[in-house]
Amino acid sequence: MNHRIKSLLILLIVAASASIHASDIEPPFGIRHYDIGKAQNFSLLDIDGEPFQLDKTRGQWVFLHFWASWCGPCREEMPTLQLLADTFSDKQLKIVMINTAEDEDTIFTFLAAINVELNSLMDTDGLVTEVWRPRGLPTTFLINPKGEVKYQAIGGREWEKPLYINFIKQLVSNKN
């Protein structure tokens, strides 16, 4: 009898620990569950002319962020995105910034003026933005290591605040 109880307890513990997924982590205010399945792949050049493909980020959490230099909330939150990037290594959280439909000179001038070291992809024709359909700018999608979109944040955030940092720490420590 004692052996059966031990076996049952072990089975329950294993089942409970296996069932904890990123979707079970409750997001802070302003971030919503957005479980829409596999993230749509894309290829874009960054501001240095280097190619980027979303599918190559599999195996890590991705912070996919759509922005524009003319967007007031985008401008305000940019320094907090730099602090977020400084908090997490590229292996923990891949921050992917996509500028929507602006030219390279505009992007360079803007990023230099606000003194951040963030790289950005250039969606100069707006086609990737059309596919992803952010409901406003800025919009952030959080994509799990399996390549599935799990969360969305519309509008600017103070990403350096502990509630967002702690939420993202929970995500990156959970590989589901």
Regions picked out by a protein language model, each given a short descriptive name:
Residues 34-36, 41-62:
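A short beta-strand-turn-helix
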Residues 19-41:
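N-proximal helix/coil linker or "cap" segments that precede and/or mark the start of modular domains
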